From Swiss-Prot:
Signal peptide extent: none
Keyword DNA-binding: yes
Listed InterPro entries: DNA_bind_arc (IPR022889), PDCD5-like (IPR002836), PDCD5-like_sf (IPR036883)
HAMAP family in the record: dsDNA_bind (MF_00026)
Swiss-Prot/TrEMBL keywords: DNA-binding
Name the record gives this protein: DNA-binding protein TV0008
Cited Gene3D superfamilies: PDCD5-like
Amino acid sequence: MSDDEELEKIRRRQMEELQRQAMQRQMAEEEEKQREIEKARRQQILRQILDPSARERLNNVRLVRPDLADNVENQLIQLASMGRINRIIKESDIIDILSKLTENKREPKIERRSK
């Protein structure tokens, strides 16, 4: 095999690697774009069905329990998309929903025994 052929193989491999990396970057950018679109759609729905104090309450819950806030948001968005929410949700409604979701949950108690 001549030096020219080896050099051409190396160039071809490098070009393929660069193309593969560019493709991966493009796919990652597309996925990020889709996540942003979905996030904007969710925020728009929540702005339509929640009053400002309810949104603030949910954001405060998100600081402490992001999983609980996501759960409440998902339920509200699902109900709104099914047409089952026919009024603006107030802060007191959010408090009721949160209390119902957390009343049966018991936090595990960790005891540390020293010798």
